[in-house]
């Protein structure tokens, strides 16, 4: 019987708007027992590349190269890519570009909206486009505080789609790492990809401790454009 692994597939570093460095993220993920992580900084893969290099030299943790792409229609996470995906394209073109690299396209927090205007407009999730385009998976557990309703909507959407369900912390601070996670058969990136492609993943979530919520609030006050309006 294959031992189950645990992955966090949505994380940010100082390469975009996260507080932890790639090295800190790797060390912390290792310390809490994760087997695979995907570093998915906004519109860059530099953090992921640095994290992967550090993990290979210093730990047994596996790092999937990822990117949270700011498409014209909302954020899309690319997994298993080798080159940066250009932001600003339509969601359809973004998914196509990800697949062109042999990557997997994930509809993350598909129903999250914000009232604050950002570089990519006011839409942060692709919404019902998750059902219309060829996404490989849907993020149904996101550990951002206040996302309960958004997660429930994503779960209901995915029940109809039958796509692989993923959990990703959307961590911007170390306290968030692993708070939402994906369980899969195996403990390697290859096994994880197989699980996503065959729909054998299970998404889960853990509650924050009080101090973690306080730190997240502090991060939010410094990054108002990324705070969800609930």
Predicted regions located by residue number:
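Charged catalytic cores and adjacent phosphate/nucleic-acid-binding surfaces used
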Residues: 1-15, 19-27, 32, 46-49, ...
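Conserved beta-strand positions
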Residues: 39-42, 107, 140, 168
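Short acidic/polar active-site loop segments enriched in Thr and Asp
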Residues: 35
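Short beta-strand/loop segments at the ligand-binding rim of alpha/beta enzyme cores
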Residues: 60, 101-106, 110-111
